[in-house]
C-alpha cells in the first residue's frame, strides 16, 4: 500500500469521526421528538435519491427521533390519468379534481405510492404503516372553496391519536394526502398543507419540506443567494416584499402557519442533494433554509 493511500484512508476515517461526533449533540437533543417530513419532487422520481431518503427516515427512527412522512405523487397521478385517457387540468396551480380524477388520485396515492414507500422503509429495516386522511379519522377535509376545481380540499381537523399511538411504539407513519369530509366525500389536499397541519397538531420539533430548490433565495435565479435562517416575522416580510414568489409562496406560508401553531422550526431543503435530511438535521451548517418560530431558543 502506498503512503498516499494510507494518508487518504486516515483522512477519510477522520472525516467519518468528525461527522459522527458532530451529529451526537443533535441526536441527543432531538431524541423522542417528532419530525414531520413532506416527501415529493425529484427525490420521489429518482430511484437513487428515493433510496437515500428512505434510509434517512429509517436512520432518524433508529437514533430515537419520531419521523412522520407525508407524501405527494403528482407525476404518477399524471401518468395514470394519461393511461386512462383522462386529461390532467390545472387552475391557478391546483389540480382540477372532478369525480373520475378523484378516483385516480385516491387509487394512485393511497394504493400505489403510499404502499411502495411503506414497503421500501420496511425493506430498509424500519417499521412503516401506510395511512391516508380517512384512516382513524386522521384528517377531516373541507372544500377548498375556489370555483371550478372540483374535489380539492383543505384540512378542517387533524385527529392525532393514531399518529401518536404508532410513533410512540416505534412505527413510522406514512401519510398520503387524501381525506374525506363529514359526509364521506373524498378530497385531494396539497401534501405541503397536510404536512404542515399534522406538524402543528402534534407540536412537532420540526417540519421539513423536501423540494427541488435549495431553499429561500434572495434571487431565485442564483442558488448562491440562499438565505440559511430567518424567523417567522422575516419570513412573512419576504413574502410581502416579493422575494418569495411563485411556487415558493405556498411552501413558506405552510411553514409560517405551522410555526404560528407551535412547531419549533421549519426547513425548506433541496431533496436533490444526497442525504439532505441528515445533513440538515445533524450538522452545524445545514443545507437549506431554516425558519424559526418565535419561541425557539
Curated annotation (Swiss-Prot):
Location in the cell reads: Cytoplasm
Which GO BP terms sit in this record? Answer: arginine biosynthetic process via ornithine; L-arginine biosynthetic process
Known SUPFAM superfamilies for this protein?
Carbamate kinase-like
Annotated positions for site Transition state stabilizer: 38, 251
Keywords annotated in UniProt: Amino-acid biosynthesis, Arginine biosynthesis, ATP-binding, Cytoplasm, Kinase, Nucleotide-binding, Transferase
Looking up HAMAP family in the UniProt record yields:
ArgB
Protein name from the UniProt record: Acetylglutamate kinase
Q: Which organism is it from?
A: Nostoc sp. (strain PCC 7120 / SAG 25.82 / UTEX 2576)
- Phylogenetic classification of the source organism: Bacteria, Bacillati, Cyanobacteriota, Cyanophyceae, Nostocales
